[in-house]
């Protein structure tokens, strides 16, 4: 019952129970200390709760509270499939006092600039096809994979940066030659890096900024924006799986 609102939202976005299980989507209930109390009962210290990024600390360290409350939750996994952080979307569309999306802060194991959401699922197909599609959000990755675009990944609430470039180069077979200042890579030639962010002005700006980071790829780089302003999740919902190429 607590997760009913989360289920309604996700079903309305075209995701069924199988797809939610595939991506490990969950729910963090409302309340300030649900998770903190469970973790304390299992022997974790308050310092460990805060260090994990799952809990925050009040002024003066007087209170430890759940960072994620009343949110749909996505596990963020590294390339090996190990969970290193979480991303959460608020359920209420009316409460503008809290961020719509909230990610785990920087921790000993989570560095947002070094993680691409969905890479654990996409890595084999990226290496095989020499193609990667970079989208903006968690539901966009889900929609793309469910539509057969299994090379889709997303940044985790940050811009596409130098560390992301290095990750993609490695998967595509791009090899840097520092002495020459160029990128070479036989496997990457003919490969593709496609950025497809939201169709609004902010999304287009983000895509062009990401494209600017990419000018040293041996693979071809493209920016794809839907003419109607749809993101991949909206496009799949409006026009079906075949609408995402």
Where are these regions (language model features)?
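Conserved active-site segments centered on acidic
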Residues: 1-8
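Mid-domain, small-residue-enriched loop/turn segments at the edges of structured enzyme/sensor domains
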Residues: 13, 21, 144
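Terminal amphipathic helices with adjacent charged low-complexity linkers/tails
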Residues: 20-21, 25-27, 31, 224
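Conserved short loop/turn motifs at secondary-structure junctions
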Residues: 23-28, 65, 198-200
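Phosphate-handling DNA/RNA-contact segment within nucleic-acid enzymes
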Residues: 31-189, 207
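Acidic, metal-coordinating catalytic cores used for nucleic-acid/nucleotide bond scission
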Residues: 139, 157-160, 197-207, 225, ...
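Phosphate/diphosphate-binding loops
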Residues: 184, 191-216, 221
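C-terminal or mid-to-C-terminal helical accessory/interaction module adjacent to the motor/catalytic core
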Residues: 218-245
């Amino acid at each position: 019952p607590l997760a009913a609102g989360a289920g309604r939202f996700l079903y309305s976005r075209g995701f069924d129970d199988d797809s939610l299980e595939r991506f490990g989507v969950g729910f963090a209930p409302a309340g300030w200390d649900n998770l903190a109390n469970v973790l304390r009962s299992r022997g974790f210290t308050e310092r460990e709760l805060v260090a994990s990024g799952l809990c925050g600390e009040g002024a003066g360290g007087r209170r430890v509270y759940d960072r994620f409350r009343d949110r749909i939750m996505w596990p963020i996994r590294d390339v090996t499939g190990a969970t290193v952080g979480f991303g959460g979307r608020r359920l209420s569309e009316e409460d503008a006092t809290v961020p719509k999306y909230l990610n785990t802060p920087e921790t000993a194991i989570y560095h947002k600039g070094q993680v691409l959401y969905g890479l654990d699922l996409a890595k084999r197909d990226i290496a095989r096809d020499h193609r990667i599609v970079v989208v903006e959000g968690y539901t966009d990755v889900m929609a793309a994979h469910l539509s057969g675009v299994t090379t889709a990944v997303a940044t985790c609430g940050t811009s596409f940066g130098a560390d992301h470039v290095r990750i993609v180069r490695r998967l595509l077979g791009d090899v840097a030659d520092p002495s020459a200042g160029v990128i070479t890579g036989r496997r990457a030639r003919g490969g593709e890096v496609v950025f497809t962010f939201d169709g609004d002005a902010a999304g287009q700006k983000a895509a062009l900024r990401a494209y600017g980071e990419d000018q040293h790829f041996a693979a071809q780089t493209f920016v794809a924006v839907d003419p109607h302003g749809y993101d991949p999740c909206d496009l799949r919902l409006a026009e079906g799986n075949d609408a995402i190429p």
